[in-house]
């Protein structure tokens, strides 16, 4: 059998967003991203390398000065080297995730997670309100095999007739037979499914079925993944992986996910990894003592039993024409492939060149809380949605009567256009 043993590091591709022009590519008033661009030019790639090297130098100097926090910023501990590809998805060719089926979107809205969607008011009453990654059970597939920003060790080991994929995150191991062995009956389901391998020349091909329908297909450890960790899977999920050793230093990895219950089409991710013979795989403790689920639940119950009054929103001074244009209800839908999430706002013209505003609610339920940190500078509007995971909006009241901008949080940033819904 071909020798593909290696100590690989997924973090080397962790700067590459999942979708083309996604994640941190969105900025308010930034130049539009080129959706046709799958690869950086030589000049662009060299400039990305220059900026990355400069950040590494800053991190190295910080480490020498004893500033541990600053030294961990980039490149020194996690070698997230710029890549030439602009996105991880190579199929569909547009570099975007396929749309979810109606059933997929219905299931997405039922999923639990400790990551809030824009405007969502999360509550926790038990383990079922969290996903499997929150609970340190598994990231599932294909999530486990996506490049992410920390604990990215991926060791490939071999024995006669077997290949072992050993992962640093969640310290999982997949033992993959490459010869004919007895198949699992279809009624037996596993978190990471049932894998079978075969060789096509020097390429290892692994097909995996028999999944438990409890894992998100993707999660937020991947730059540019859909927010909220609401990406369901079904028992009909099938994952196909291809691994080939290109030379002594570089391995090419590809993974395809198809799930007719959830996805309207399959999608494929491909990226290179470098072999690092000195890579040490430390213990992955997840959250120490597995206490986070209990703490979240206890805190959520306490906060609901003892609600903190919302601070009063001071009226915000604006011009008369802006007050008139904003007055009324607005609805916007950020681009989130997994859910159709409508966000409804209400601005009130106080009649004295000031306005107030609140979040009426979202598709997930009514909120009726004042917008936080509301500022209006000319026609530029900024505010924070009042929920557990702060989402900050920055946009502009346009000449065509819409409110266009970006809503962003630690999960990434999303373009959104709010349109008038009901005039007062």
Predicted segment positions?
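Residue-level recognition of beta-strand termini and adjacent short loop/turns
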Residues: 247, 351, 399-401
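Extended lipid/amphipathic-ligand handling interfaces
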Residues: 374, 395-397
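Alpha-helical, heptad-rich or low-complexity scaffold/stalk segments
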Residues: 392-393, 402-404
């Amino acid at each position: 059998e071909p020798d593909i043993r290696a100590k690989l590091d997924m973090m080397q591709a962790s700067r590459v967003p999942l979708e083309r022009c996604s994640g941190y590519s969105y900025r308010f008033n930034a130049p539009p991203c080129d959706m046709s661009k799958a690869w950086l030019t030589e000049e662009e790639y060299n400039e990305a390398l220059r900026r990355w090297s400069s950040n590494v130098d800053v991190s190295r100097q910080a480490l020498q000065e004893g500033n541990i926090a600053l030294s961990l910023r980039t490149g020194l501990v996690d070698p997230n080297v710029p890549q030439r590809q602009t996105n991880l998805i190579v199929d569909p060719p547009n570099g975007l995730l396929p749309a979810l089926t109606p059933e997929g979107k219905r299931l997405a809205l039922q999923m639990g997670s400790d990551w809030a969607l824009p405007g969502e008011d999360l509550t926790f009453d038990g383990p079922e309100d969290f996903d499997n990654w929150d609970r340190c059970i598994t990231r599932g597939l294909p999530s486990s095999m996506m490049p992410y920003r920390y604990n990215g060790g991926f060791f490939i080991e071999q024995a006669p007739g077997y290949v072992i994929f050993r992962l640093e995150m969640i310290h999982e191991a997949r033992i993959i037979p490459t010869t004919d062995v007895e198949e699992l009956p279809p009624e037996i389901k596993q978190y990471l499914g049932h894998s079978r391998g075969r060789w096509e020349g020097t390429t290892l091909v692994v097909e995996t079925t028999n999944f438990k329908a409890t894992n998100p297909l993707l999660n937020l450890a991947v730059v540019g993944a859909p927010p909220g960790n609401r990406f369901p899977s079904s028992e009909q999920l099938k994952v196909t992986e291809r691994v080939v050793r290109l030379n002594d230093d570089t391995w090419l990895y590809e993974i395809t996910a198809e799930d007719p219950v959830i996805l309207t089409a399959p999608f494929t991710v491909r990226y290179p990894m470098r072999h690092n013979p000195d890579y040490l795989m430390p213990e992955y403790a997840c959250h120490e003592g597995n206490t986070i689920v209990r703490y979240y639940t206890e805190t959520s119950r306490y906060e609901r039993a003892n609600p903190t009054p919302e601070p009063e929103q001071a009226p915000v001074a604006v011009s008369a024409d802006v007050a008139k244009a904003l007055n009324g209800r607005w609805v916007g839908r950020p681009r989130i492939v997994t859910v159709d999430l409508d966000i409804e706002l209400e601005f009130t013209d106080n009649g004295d060149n000031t306005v107030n505003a609140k979040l009426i609610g979202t598709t997930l339920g009514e909120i009726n809380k004042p917008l936080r940190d509301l500022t209006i500078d000319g026609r530029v509007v900024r505010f924070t949605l009042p929920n557990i995971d702060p989402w900050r909006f920055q946009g502009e009241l346009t000449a065509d009567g819409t409110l266009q901008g970006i809503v962003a949080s630690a999960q990434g940033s999303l373009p959104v256009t709010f349109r008038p819904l009901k005039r007062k």
